Amino acid sequence: MNLLSSDGVQVLPRPFTLNERRREVRSFVLRQGHFTPAQKRAFDHYWPRFGVDFIGQLRDLDVLFGRSAPKVLEVGFGNGAALRFAAQHEPRYDYIGIEVYAPGVGRLLNGLAEDGSRHVRLYHYDAVEVLNKEIVDGALDEIRIYFPDPWHKKRHHKRRLIQPLFATLLVRKLRVGGCLHMATDWADYAEQMWDVLDATPGLVNRAGLRGQVPCPDWRVQTRFERRGQNLGHRVWNLLYDRV
């Protein structure tokens, strides 16, 4: 039998010991960046309302949000513009955002408080860790990944987020009938996304093999997108269904 605490955490049969936690290898570094005073205050005032502290135990997301609704995850939300826009325009969904860049988290916290949002929760942590240890398989209706770091030098391509193991992890967390939406303004990253996702069991490109879709109305144009367009880059929107 699964035991749930009041904050939606599924209590595991044997939690990690302190020594086990120390031995874990982190695949990321939390990025502090330059905090404005307002962003610092946002963490102090609004993290208890919107933030989720990583504890390494599976969560019941319906308990976490206090309702049963479709769950959307945005990985690497940056300054939070896309996530905030979606929360404003699609209130029937519950949103989970993950970001390692602290000033971006602070900026979004301020925006969510200004909007009076009730259906958004944020992690300031690594997406792989959160997905592996806190999200139940099949719990998500949609995953959104917009303009991940392209690591444009060829020798750095191995650092890109969209790799076979990560794609398999995303498939596990999506329910059948859910979808994965990604956007990039780097042509060779779009090619890599197609290579990886077309070869991942459980995903089917809604636009056909190596196809793309128009920008959906749920995605606002980000500053990264505008910057890319100013540099002459086009944007690829890839939409995959979980089957």
Swiss-Prot record:
- Pathway named in the protein's UniProt entry: tRNA modification; N(7)-methylguanine-tRNA biosynthesis
What InterPro entries would the database entry show?
SAM-dependent_MTases_sf, tRNA_(Gua-N-7)_MeTrfase_Trmb, tRNA_methyltr_TrmB_bact
Q: Residues that bind S-adenosyl-L-methionine, according to the entry? A: 74, 99, 126, 149
Supply one GO molecular-function term: tRNA (guanine(46)-N7)-methyltransferase activity
Q: Name the positions where substrate binds.
A: 153, 185, 222-225
**Recorded GO CC terms:** tRNA methyltransferase complex
Catalytic reaction list: guanosine(46) in tRNA + S-adenosyl-L-methionine = N(7)-methylguanosine(46) in tRNA + S-adenosyl-L-homocysteine
The cysteines joined by S-S bonds are none
A Pfam family this chain is assigned to: Methyltransf_4
Query: What family is reported?
Result: Belongs to the class I-like SAM-binding methyltransferase superfamily. TrmB family.
Described by its record, this protein's role is as follows: Catalyzes the formation of N(7)-methylguanine at position 46 (m7G46) in tRNA.
Question: What's the protein called, per UniProt?
Answer: tRNA (guanine-N(7)-)-methyltransferase
Provenance organism: Xylella fastidiosa (strain Temecula1 / ATCC 700964)
